[in-house]
Amino acid sequence: MYLVITKSYPPEVGGMQNLMWGLTNSLSKYFMIKVFADYQDQHQNYDKEVSFSIERIGGIKLLRKYRKAHLVNEFIKNNKNIEGIISDHWKSLELIKTNKKKICLIHSKEINHNEGTSLNKRVLNILNNVDHVISNSEYTKNLAINCGVNSSKITVINPGVNPAKELNKKTIKEAENLLKNKSPRLITVSRLDKRKNHEKIIMALRNLKQTYPNIIYTCIGDGDEEENLKQLVKELGLDEQVLFLKKISQDLKNTLVAKSNIFVMPSIFYKKSVEGFGIAFIEAAQYGIPSIGGKDGGAADAIEHQKNGLICDGNSLDEIYSSINDLLNDKKYLEYGKIAKENSTKFYWDKIIEKYKKILN
C-alpha cells in the first residue's frame, strides 16, 4: 500500500488539485492507495467515485498539518503493509516519522527560496532525505538543483491529463452565443494574477484590433487582478473584444477552449512565483488549439517552439503581439493545432503513470 499525503485535492479547484486527483486515480489501478487530504465542503461527491480510501482532515488550518501528520504516523505504526509515501509538497513530509520509501513532488514556487535562508534549509532537509523527487518539468528540476537539491534524486515526470471529453450540442450553442460569431478567438484559462500576464495580452489586443476588428479574447478564471484587468479593458476601449468569465461549468470551459484559435498564457516571473509547467497548454492542445507561452518557467516542456505553438518573452509587449500575429497570419494556428493535438496524447495518464510505476516498483 502507498499513502498519499496532499494539501491540494478536489473538490477544491486548480492545477495541483487536478494533478493529485489524476495521479491517485491512476495509481489505484496498480497499487493499494490511501489518501490523506484536507477537508473540503461537498467532498463526498468526489470520494464516493473512487475505489480507494480517502481520509479527510478538517479543523483549524494552522493545526491541520499536525493532525494530519499524527494520523499518518499512527496509520503507519498500525499497518505493516505500507510500501511508501507520496507527497504533493515538502511541508507535508516534515512531521512524518518513518523509514518507509518517500517520494515528494515539486512544482517550482514552493522550493524557490534564497540559499541559506531558513525556508531553503527546511526544503533541503526534506528533499535531500527522501528517496525520489518528482519534478513537473526540466525547468523545475534545474531550479531545484540550483537551490541545493541532490540532482541524482530528481526525475522529471510531467503532469498527466485524461483524454478530452466530447463536446455536447447544448454547450456548443452556449459557447457560440457568448462568442457572438466573433473571430479570431484568443483564450486564457487561469487565475487572474500578475504572473499569468493577462495585462500584456490585453495591451497587445489594442494593436491587433486594427488588423482584426472582430477579434475576441476570453479570460476564464478569477483572482486578485480581476478589477485591474477590467479597468484596463475599459480604458483601452476593448469592452467588445474581451470576455471575462468565472465559475462556469467544466463542459462550457472545454467548449470555449475548443472553439478558440489560440491559447495565450505568456507567464512571467513575479516575485518568487513562476509557471512550473502549464497543464492548461496540454488541455488546449487536446482540442487542436496551439499555445503561446512565456520563456520564464516550464512552458517549454509543453510547447515545442514553432511546432505546436510559440515561446516568447512575456515581459515584451512586442513579442506577445508578434507571436499572436504570427499564428493568425495565414491561419498558421491550424497547422500548429494539428501537431498540438497529436502531441497531447503523450501526456495521457495511462502513459504518464508508467513512469511512476518504474519508480514505485
Range-by-range predicted roles:
Residues 258-273, 289:
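Acidic donor-binding loop of glycosyltransferase active sites
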Residues 139, 160:
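Carbohydrate-associated surface elements
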Residues 184, 214, 241, 319, ...:
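A short, well-ordered alpha-helix in the C-terminal region of glycosyltransferases
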Residues 227-248:
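Nucleotide-activated donor-binding/catalytic signature segment of Leloir-type glycosyltransferases, i.e.
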Residues 6-13, 19-64:
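N-terminal strand-loop element at the rim of the active site
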